[in-house]
Amino acid sequence: MSDPTRPARIDERSRNVTEGVMRAPNRSMYYAMGYRETDFSKPMVGVASAHSTITPCNSGLQPLADTVVAALKEAGANPQLFGTPTVSDGIGMGTEGMKYSLVSREVIADSIETCVNGLWQDGVVVIGGCDKNMPGGMMALVRTNVPGIYVYGGTIKPGHYQGRDLNIISVFEAVGEFTAGRLDPVDFKEIEKRACPGSGSCGGMYTANTMSAAFEALGMSLPYSSTMANEDAEKLASAAESARVLVEAIKRGLRPRDIVTREAIENAVSVIMATGGSTNAVLHFLAIAHAAEVPWTIDDFECIRRRVPVIVDMKPSGHYLATDLHQAGGIPQVMKLLLEAGLLHGECVTITGRTIAEVLENVPAAPRADQGVIRTLSDPLYAEGHLAILRGNLSPEGCVAKISGLKNPAITGPARVFDSEDDAMGAIMARRIVEGDVVVIRYEGPKGGPGMREMLAPTSALVGQGLGESVGLITDGRFSGGTWGMVVGHVSPEAFVGGPIALVRDGDSVTIDAHRQLVQLNVGDEELARRAADWTPPSPRYTRGVLAKFAKLTSSASKGAVTDLDL
């Protein structure tokens, strides 16, 4: 670990472009932006902002960026604001545009790394909102390993209609209800208009809120910051404090890899399990661990699942939203319960310089009695975690199932096979999928999609049609954090590389059994061998541009779908 007592130069990196006779031209560029000679002894701190009017998840980030810039100046640093791209999962969902979502994780990580290292910045504040902003930013922080902190843009507040709280998943499920004749046109339109009342990331324990909670547990974001609403004043105050904390970290030489250790990742994943977080966290923490050079495998999630119960009652399968969790005590309250039970590593250091145990010292040992969001460990929603790693002849490298909230976590039924999400969605909307079917959506993996689209539209349509627990769905693609039901994703190896999912035929018997951690194609080995011999790899869907590059470089989902695994 970096020595927190060392008298380090706080411009240790930036002096490469500001110090000495040979750097006069470099300094001249800074003078053009209003720098003074005395500024060159201050740390240059990047502010990587994903502000955008593309999506409500990011449309409220500019005030946070402005606040961070001002606070950095007050703390004696030179803020250097730059932008990172974002892709809206909610807007791209169900279209070809969704293929760019996971790709954007890599683009975000690459863009931040490029600016931080290209400009010799001494530290960086990453400000993000939508789903892939989260892992992309954290991957960049641990790659560059300069002092850094993550500032989450904050959650959206709930919408309201007829006495019911709404969020974006309400609209996706309303599509299924409407097509099934269970929702009239007026109510359908009102839900569409009222679900998202302002700025902030999708409000349940979906992917963005899952990752923000995990970053708080990881020690890379400030306490309580992950559940604050974007539009509330406390979010601005937290952003300013984040800037001040980062400057102190620069002075101490405290770096991301001092914080993001194997034990810290175990803490983060424990919180993901306890809060009922998104399946995407499996993919993203494989990628973050890879970037941090921390040994971590898909089986490590399973080890933690077996010892950590679900104690937070959050949507999509539960009842509450992130704003409710914040009012109930936020992630520190959840972490305190886990720490008291011996389920967290209290010695892990955080960006504040304090340990997890020190940060949680004054948090109550028990949740308040006047709230229903956070349970005790003696009265959990589920005795074990909800993200199960399944294996079988259909997915020998492993796949991910979200098993919370299911009355019967096992199904055996006939396969209904589709070679794209679009074909599957057409069949669902035409009511051709019936109770007992197992929908198989393939050629949607990291290479085959490419980009591993999220299957939120088909899963939500099934839920809306009343088939969420009576129809299984298996895919080499991903799921949104808002997905629930009998669903299995990240099937590896994927169809595009000849994985067993490519061999499934319509009508084959398929079993999903979460209790046995099994995903099985009930076809004999000899028949599967014949099918494998007859299988031919498909042509790439893209041969130019960023999707083609991603398809060429990406690893298996079981390794995090990273693009620099074998370089």
Swiss-Prot record:
Native source organism of the sequence: Aromatoleum aromaticum (strain DSM 19018 / LMG 30748 / EbN1)
Pfam families for this protein: ILV_EDD_C, ILVD_EDD_N
N6-carboxylysine modification, residue list: 132
Family membership: Belongs to the IlvD/Edd family.
Record-level Gene Ontology MF annotations: 2 iron, 2 sulfur cluster binding; dihydroxy-acid dehydratase activity; magnesium ion binding
Superkingdom of origin: Bacteria
Assembly notes: Homodimer.
Positions of Mg(2+) binding: 89, 131-132, 454
Origin organism lineage: Bacteria, Pseudomonadati, Pseudomonadota, Betaproteobacteria, Rhodocyclales
Protein name: Dihydroxy-acid dehydratase 3
GO biological process annotation, one example: isoleucine biosynthetic process
